[in-house]
From Swiss-Prot:
Lineage of the species this protein comes from: Bacteria, Pseudomonadati, Pseudomonadota, Gammaproteobacteria, Enterobacterales
Coiled-coil residues: none
Entry keywords, A to Z: ATP synthesis, Cell inner membrane, Cell membrane, CF(0), Hydrogen ion transport, Ion transport, Membrane, Transmembrane, Transmembrane helix, Transport
Transmembrane segments: 41-61, 101-121, 147-167, 221-241, 243-263
GO cellular component: plasma membrane; proton-transporting ATP synthase complex
Name of the protein this chain belongs to: ATP synthase subunit a
Protein's membrane topology: Multi-pass membrane protein
Organism listed in the record: Erwinia tasmaniensis (strain DSM 17950 / CFBP 7177 / CIP 109463 / NCPPB 4357 / Et1/99)
Keyword Methyltransferase (UniProt): no
Length: 272
């Protein structure tokens, strides 16, 4: 839908909640206003921005690491050292295993999720306007963490690591006993234990992904509502205070995702 065709606040809000989608059957862009979304579509805007932000993280940290000095650090080096120290302290406090992968993983998760969340602070119409008028894109959403597919995919990656460390530390037999003999240590309760432990295990990635998605989707929606329902001269009254408050939200959600990942992997790494 072109900007000139948007005549009501409802159309404006709906336009900004549509993803740029690729039909995997025809490999053509989907016009969200012509046909409803199906299973065989890929949200390429979410994929694009998540990959780009991941590359920004890698390039930025690599450049700072290559140019780091033992003397008085610059502002960027000092900021990155502060982030690394903060993440490392959390890993030392919460993870009691011996893996050397957890700290880099936690750092990657924290910075990557923060960068994806930070996209919510960009002017709501800036990148969609550029995409529509210069690239001819029918829709564009720029906050990857407001897409449930992205957050659940990240949570699925954490879930795979939970299973990996559980089996690595406890063995197949120990992990099986954990699923079948807890909380009731009697063979007659194996079906009940399996259901309870299975639900508990599956709830970890589901809650991890949906928590991040829900908070970021709500934040994005509030920005869209402010822009769509209020006249331009009064939008600053609400958007600026909400943006300031939203800085806390995007940082907190990145921190929570990181902390829960560390805790889940620490629990999986405990030997029984």
């Amino acid at each position: 839908m072109a900007a000139g065709e948007i005549s009501t606040p409802q159309e404006y809000i709906g336009h900004h909640l549509n993803n740029l989608q690729l039909d995997l059957r025809t490999f053509e862009l989907v016009n969200p206003h012509d046909a409803p979304a199906t299973f065989w579509v890929l949200n390429i805007d979410s994929m694009f921005f998540s990959v780009v932000l991941g590359l920004v993280f890698l390039v930025l940290f690599r450049q700072v690491a290559k140019s780091a000095t033992s003397g008085v650090p610059g502002k960027l080096q000092a900021a990155i050292e502060l982030v690394i120290g903060f993440v490392d302290n959390n890993v030392r406090d919460m993870y009691h295993g011996k893996s050397k992968v957890i700290a880099p993983l936690a750092l990657t998760i924290f910075v990557w999720v923060f960068l994806m969340n930070f996209m919510d602070l960009l002017p709501i119409d800036l990148l969609p306007y550029i995409g529509e008028h210069f690239l001819g894109l029918p829709a564009l959403r720029v906050v990857p963490s407001a897409d449930v597919n992205i957050t659940l995919s990240m949570a699925l990656g954490v879930f795979v690591l939970i299973l990996f460390y559980s089996i690595k530390m406890k063995g197949i037999g120990g992990f099986s006993k954990e699923l079948t003999l807890q909380p009731f240590n009697h063979p007659i309760f194996i079906p009940i234990n399996l259901i309870l432990e299975g639900v508990s295990l599956l709830s970890k990635p589901v809650s991890l992904g949906l928590r991040l998605f829900g908070n970021m989707y709500a934040g994005e929606l509030i920005f869209i509502l402010i822009a769509g329902l209020l006249p331009w001269w009064s939008q600053w009254i609400l958007s600026v205070p909400w943006a300031i408050f939203h800085i806390l939200i995007i940082s907190l959600q990145a921190f929570i995702f990181m902390v829960l990942t560390i805790v889940y992997l620490s629990m999986a790494s405990e030997e029984h």
